[in-house]
């Protein structure tokens, strides 16, 4: 899912286009 958060993303996520892309199994 994609969430709007600061550059400090949760572990296992990538900061792309001012958004954090988190891949969930």
From Swiss-Prot:
Subcellular location: Secreted
Tissue: Expressed by the venom gland.
GO molecular function ontology, one term from the record: serine-type endopeptidase inhibitor activity
Keywords: Antibiotic, Antimicrobial, Disulfide bond, Fungicide, Hemostasis impairing toxin, Immunity, Innate immunity, Protease inhibitor, Secreted, Serine protease inhibitor, Toxin
GO biological process, one term: defense response to bacterium
InterPro entries, A to Z: Secapin
Gene Ontology CC terms: extracellular region
Annotated S-S bridges: 9-20
Entry-linked Pfam families: Secapin (PF17521)
Role according to the record: Serine protease inhibitor which exhibits antifibrinolytic, antielastolytic and antimicrobial activities. Displays antimicrobial activity against bacteria and fungi. Likely functions in the innate immune response to microbial infection and possibly in the venom, as an antifibrinolytic agent.
Family: Belongs to the secapin family.
Annotated protein name in UniProt: Secapin-1
Organism: Apis mellifera (Honeybee)
């Amino acid at each position: 899912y994609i969430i709007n958060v600061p550059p400090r993303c949760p572990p296992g996520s990538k900061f792309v286009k001012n958004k954090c892309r988190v891949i969930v199994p």
